[in-house]
């Protein structure tokens, strides 16, 4: 057995034999810390857009929440289901099955991203109008979402495989990937918004780049030889049984995100009659609550 295989086996033995209380602490603390750090995405974007672009931009930002909710729902459909299946299969010592889930999850996320990026990119104006955009907020919403769309692929890959990383025995490393993305966004957002004077586009571009950093860090983990689960040949062909097992588990949390989309659509359209000040107020509240894979 090589050193890399020994390290991977040691991780699995720790999951099998360590006290439950210790495992709970080791896995829950990095998760909580990582999620708190990720909230910086929302806080930083909201503050900088408000100061650098204006109050109307916050209203436009609120219109984009349903789009992000739908994209997140598709990511959760795969990410949450794959994470649970990986945990179960590793517990059963079925490493081949866990690897197939990993490969199928990658293909499904890429397919999902291609579909929603294409649909939103082609029909963005009618979609935003249906989601409550007015003549004043549409330009801001369009600018933000068109630049953010490519980054939603990176977001789904980063968060989906971040959860799988945690489930396969690497909670601290999973936390580090989220911290990396948040810090990158904290540095890049002011540069793109103020220094380069790109406004709301700059916020979206900074988020895209930050999530790309996180995605690269996450995906690099799964090509290492010393991990419990890695990308290998022969795991990317979609199998109906594997896809069904992923989707059946991920459907419930995905529906929660989809429901958030429809709630936001109703709120946006209801507020349109009251004017932009109310939209801005609710937009700030919604932005504070929204985060990918919440």
Where are these regions (language model features)?
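Short alpha-helical transmembrane segments in multi-pass integral membrane proteins
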Residues: 1-31, 86-153, 184, 193-251
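Hydrophobic/aromatic residues within the transmembrane alpha-helices of Major Facilitator Superfamily
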Residues: 36-40, 70, 74, 78, ...
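Small-residue-rich hydrophobic transmembrane alpha-helices
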Residues: 58-118, 155-174, 268, 281-283
